[in-house]
Amino acid sequence: MSMNSIKPGAYQPLCPLQALVLTLGVCESSVKRWGDSGKLPAAKTAGGHRKVALPSIAGFLRETGHPVAQPELLGMVASGVARPLDEARDQLFEALVNGRESESRELVLGFYQQGESVPRLGDMLIGPVFRKIGVEWAAGRVQVYQERRSCEVMMAVLHELRRWLPEPEPRAPLGLVGTPLRDFAEVPVRLVELTLLAQGWRVTPVGSGLPLEEILDTTRANSPLLLCLSATHLEHPEDFLRKYQALLIDPLRESHPTVQHALGGGAVERAC
C-alpha cells in the first residue's frame, strides 16, 4: 500500500483503516488495492499504523462517486441523488433561517462529496441564498436573529468543510484574506479562504473590519503573492474605492510590486 510519513502536528485528520472499511462498506483488500493504485493513499503514523487522511478520502469519493455505507463514522454525509446546485437554494434558505444546522450540513457537504468545487458552492448555492436572506431581511420577512443564526450555521458548515481540504505544501503561494473597516461579514471571506486552500494555496486571514492602513502594514509584513479583500457592507462604496486605490494599492505597488490584489463582494458589485 502506498505509504507516506505523517509529520507530527500537521493539520491532517487521519482515519484508521478499519473505520474506513466500515464507512465505505467494503473489504480491507479493496482499500489496500486502491492504496496500491494510488487512488486512496495511506500514511504511516509514528507507531507504524496505516491510516488515511480525510482529504484523501474526500478526493477519492469526489473522483469515483463511491457510495458511503456508514457516513456517521467519519462525520460524512449519506450519498444522495445528484441535482443542480440551484435546485437546492430554497431548501438551504429554509434550513438556514430556521437554524437547521444538520440539514444545511447535509446539503453543502453532500454536494462537495459528490464532486462540486468550493467556488461553485459559493457562486451557485451559498452566495445566492445569502443574498436572498439579505433581501428578505430588508423586507421584514426575515428577523435579525434569523440572519445572524444563518451566518453561524454556515460558518459551522464551512469549518467542517475545511477538514476535508488537503493541507497546502510549505512552499505553496501565500494569500491574505480579510474585510475592510466596519465589514464583519464572515461567510464571504471564509469562502475566499477555502477557495484558495482548495487550489493548494497557503492562506492567512488578516482579520475582519480592518482599516486600509492596517491591511497595508500586514501585507507588507507577510509579502504574499495575493491579497484578497471581501467587501459585503460599505457605508460609502465610491469613497471606499477611491481610498482603496490611494491608501492601499498605490503604496503597495511602490513597496511590493509583485503582490497581486483582488477586491470583491456584494458591496463592490453594487458600486460598479
Locate the predicted segments by residue:
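Polyanion-binding surface elements
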Residues: 2-30
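Long amphipathic alpha-helical segments
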Residues: 28-30, 39, 43-166
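Residues in the recognition helix of alpha-helical DNA-binding motifs
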Residues: 34
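Residue-level detector of anion-binding/catalytic polar loops
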Residues: 41, 202, 225
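Flexible loop/N-cap segments at domain edges
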Residues: 177
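A general structural motif
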Residues: 181, 185-187, 206-219
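Short helix-loop-beta junction
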Residues: 190-204
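Cofactor-cradling patches in redox/metallo enzymes
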Residues: 210-271
